[in-house]
Amino acid sequence: MLCCMRICVCGDEGTGKSSLITSLVKGVFVTNKIQPILPQITIPPTIGTPENVTTTTVVDTSAVPQERSNLAREIRKSNVILLVYSDHYSYERVALFWLPYFRSLGVNVPVVLCANKSDLAADHTETQVIEDEMLPLMSEFKEIDSCIRTSAREHRNVNEAFFLCQKAVTHPIAPLFDAKESALKPAAVAALQRIFYLSDKDRDGYLSDKEIKDFQMRCFEKPLSEEDLVHIKETIQKTHPDSVTPSGIDCRGFIHLNKMYAEKGRHETVWIILRAFQYTDSLSLQESYLHPKFEVPPFASAELSPEGYRFFVNLFLLSDKDNDGGLNDAELASLFAPTPGLPPSWADGSFPSCTVRNEAGHVTLQGWLAQWSMTTFTSPKTTLEYLAYLGFESSDRSNPSTTAALKVTRPRKRRKRPGRVGRNVVLGHIVGAPGSGKSALLDAFLSRGFSTTYHPTIQPRTAVNTVELPGGKQCYLIMDELGELEPAILENQAKLLDQCDVIVYTYDSSDPDSFAYIPALRAKYPHLEELPSVYIALKADLDRTTQRAEHQPHEYTALLNMPGPPLHVSVTWSSIQEVFVHIAEAAMEPSTAFPRSEEDVEGKWMSWGIALGAVVCAGAAAVMIWRRVSGSGV
């Protein structure tokens, strides 16, 4: 909110500056002699004062040379300048002296041009003055926001002149309209195009009558009458007859309507629309709207809330114009039209190849939701930013922010404690020797075909998909191959333990030198022991070979007291999907993927001993019975 607006009244001597101020304060023309420079006055808000103005300070100035330093100081302190002229000479001085002088001071404030003493120019009509005097100046000097004819003697348009000054600050024309080109500026057009897109709820390219009425309520908080609706359509049809159809008003007509508002001095209407959609004076979205406060505690994570998932589901369904169950390039481009484009992290992650696609290569609904689940997990601020760009509206009155689309999971500090973690999105890092099959594992995760060509992974690669757990519950599993960043990621202990839910160790069971990479890696980064782990022997369709390592894989995992030996699997087998379930379960129930404690091992040996004892006893009893039966038969 603007706590105090300063209006600096400038102009040649004798143009009636002080009389205008006095007439504003008194409400009538003062015939008595007025002092050369009035002291500054502060006026409270009145009816018609913009809502975000609390008080207005009006400063009188003198044009005499000895007051030039005071004049410059007041101009620099002002929010708007009311430049007054009253005859041909003072009018000529507007372009020759005053406006160049303002520019020389380096000020960037709007100027309201005021033709005072209109009672003395009865032979000039309003239209003549505007066309002959004001419009040429406005086309030459962009800083002129608006113009008005006044008469302090007749108290004509005095209040309106100062009201225009207030409006020039709260609803400036300069960011919206180029008077010289007689066109809306590109930034204004872009903002209005986004507003049209968000108001077109069914994405058919037209604002229907209902959508226009909903738009009216959102922006102006009052209903639109049928007569006003008809008038709007007729106004557009006069210059753009093709923009009004039975389906509604198209974007071209909507932009033209706002251009007309700006041309006719009704740019306040345009600003009301822009601010209803969270735009600032610089035509950027408000920072607090794009980046609301949202904290994720250590060992917790961010996920989409049910309302967030609903929003992205509806957005997908609206954007899938051909109803083929996938978003093609054109549909994605249309969907992201009100945004700066794809999130940078998506481009870096080779979207859409990192998520689920159909046979045509188009992102499916499953892949779309998985991608946003991953984005929210890794960068909740990105999701919040794009929720704002895409027009998310919270249904929660207690939380109207975009943060209503997200939720924070409970921190998981003690992963070795039995039980599930309270999250639906988990992250697993895949590590292993070069050529062990990590990339093929990611391809299989996304149901991609197996390729026999080996391409070493340089840049990190990520894949995300849903996994159905035993019992029918689903979770989103993010898996990434670290590439050249593996050392940097693994040595950052704090970040690794905070973000990673499971570490997946892979080796090529047909390569004798593959497994040795894993013990060496764990020795180099001992904090990996604090993460749940899954060991996978890939390429099981090939001949298994003895590993050149201190311990064979099954011996190594046994020495660690892991719950079981490495999983043997091939990405060419249909059973590969069970591996992803196993990985997801290890992340969701981390206690099952840690080395067993001595108590667990002793308990297992005891249960084996009891079972073995029972078998021995049963066998001995059977022998005794057989002997007795045999003896009785002799």
UniProtKB/Swiss-Prot annotation:
Mitochondrial intermembrane face of the membrane: 626-634
PROSITE patterns per UniProt: EF_HAND_1 (PS00018), EF_HAND_2 (PS50222), MIRO (PS51423)
Domain annotation EF-hand: ranges: 187-222, 307-342
Location relative to the cell: Mitochondrion outer membrane
Protein name in UniProt: Mitochondrial Rho GTPase 1
Pfam short name (any one): EF_assoc_2
Compositionally biased region (Basic residues): 409-419
Gene Ontology cellular component annotations, sorted alphabetically: ERMES complex; mitochondrial outer membrane
Domain Miro, chain residue ranges per copy: 2-171, 423-589
One Gene Ontology molecular-function label: GTPase activity
Residues that hold GTP 2 according to the record: 432-439, 468-472, 538-541
The species this protein was found in: Emericella nidulans (strain FGSC A4 / ATCC 38163 / CBS 112.46 / NRRL 194 / M139)
Annotated keywords: Calcium, GTP-binding, Hydrolase, Membrane, Metal-binding, Mitochondrion, Mitochondrion outer membrane, Nucleotide-binding, Repeat, Transmembrane, Transmembrane helix
Residue spans, topological domain Cytoplasmic: 1-604
